[in-house]
Amino acid sequence: MSIKTVKDFNSFAGKRVLVRCDFNVPLKEGSISDDTRIKAALPTIEYLKERGARIVLVSHLGRPEGKKNLKYSLKPVANRLSGLLNQDVKMFSDCIGSEIVNNTLQMKDGDVVLLENVRFYAEEEKNDKNFAKKLSENGDVFVSDAFGAAHRAHASTVGVSDYLPSVGGFLMEKEDKFLGEVLKNPEKPFVSIIGGSKVSSKIAVLESLLSKSNVVVIGGGMAYTFLYSKGYSIGKSLLESEYIDTASSFLRKAKELGVKVILPLDHIVADDFNKNSTPEYIDSLNIPENKIGMDIGVNTLKEIEKVVKTAKTIIWNGPLGVFEFDSFSKGTAKVAEMVASCSGLTVVGGGDSVAAVNKFNLSDKITHVSTGGGASLEYLEGKILPGIKVLEK
């Protein structure tokens, strides 16, 4: 089902539009180290500005645990927005209360203001009705554009929609469109590349994508549990012993469905898990008992390249090795390059794989790079996200 968007709303002129954004950006000593999420909100903000809206932005930042903590103030975001929008974005000292509401009522068409961190109130994460009502008093219309928080049923993502007409922004629409396309109607051949360290955090995604995929590539730390389940030795590599049967049953299911599963055929290993460890190549499925698997080898990459070249749809979620250590990032870098050069629909879903694509400067060559970490993962698991459900037509 598609969602209602800003384009479905008649007129924003003169209206206070409460826009839930995801400005949960990384801060280093009070300054923003990556403004990707702020830039992702700009198309919606610009669209509303052009239509004479009075824009009241709302977001969370970090985990202040329901208390006012200026370390988590959105002030740096207001400063960055002022530069990006080329206009003064006023920072309000709170997100609810009569003084704040009065200030929003004094706004002029085209004004943009930012409310203080909603998570300074414990009621936000509890989706407290009274808090949601107070928050809704800052707007006449609600626009939800925080896909990164859409898997949370909080007051600012779900609760306010009980009190205001609600539509999705362009980012929410884009995420729903591309992730939805991958799940509902992927053009074949469809290749799912799933990495990351733990089977426990990715098995639901693997199972959700299995019946739709032609090929599933499994890499990262979780691949060793799959290899172990097939009887290979994995040395000191990461093993989730309680997921050996789960891995085994997944591989059996894939075989029954005729889905090809690519596991590491060779490895880059090390003596210990350390960024300064010396990489060593093992041209075998088996890893020596005193070694740790850290990355995929050249034969595995050749196998992945064959399927990526002919793919019409690719979803990639999670790194293929310990990419945060430069010596063990080559497998992930090569896969990022392969995905970027694929002519089909390519979607990179959330978290570390997005960081990898950015690290190797390839994001502009990917059809869609998702901004949601946990939200992308839950969407790909086939779960209904509460922040999207409230926007459905």
Curated annotation (Swiss-Prot):
The keyword Nucleotide-binding applies. It is found in: Cytoplasm. It is an enzyme of class 2 (transferase). Its main location: cytoplasm. Pathway: Carbohydrate degradation; glycolysis; pyruvate from D-glyceraldehyde 3-phosphate: step 2/5. GO terms for cellular component: cytosol. Keywords: ATP-binding, Cytoplasm, Glycolysis, Kinase, Nucleotide-binding, Transferase. Its EC number is 2.7.2.3. GO terms for biological process: gluconeogenesis; glycolytic process. It catalyses: (2R)-3-phosphoglycerate + ATP = (2R)-3-phospho-glyceroyl phosphate + ADP. One of its GO terms (molecular function) is phosphoglycerate kinase activity. CDD domains: Phosphoglycerate_kinase (cd00318). InterPro entries: Phosphoglycerate_kinase, Phosphoglycerate_kinase_CS, Phosphoglycerate_kinase_N, Phosphoglycerate_kinase_sf. Coiled coil: none annotated. Substrate binds at residues 22-24, 37, 60-63, 119, 152. It comes from the Bacteria. ATP binds at residues 202, 293, 324, 350-353. Belongs to the phosphoglycerate kinase family. Monomer. HAMAP family: Phosphoglyc_kinase. This is Phosphoglycerate kinase. The gene is pgk.
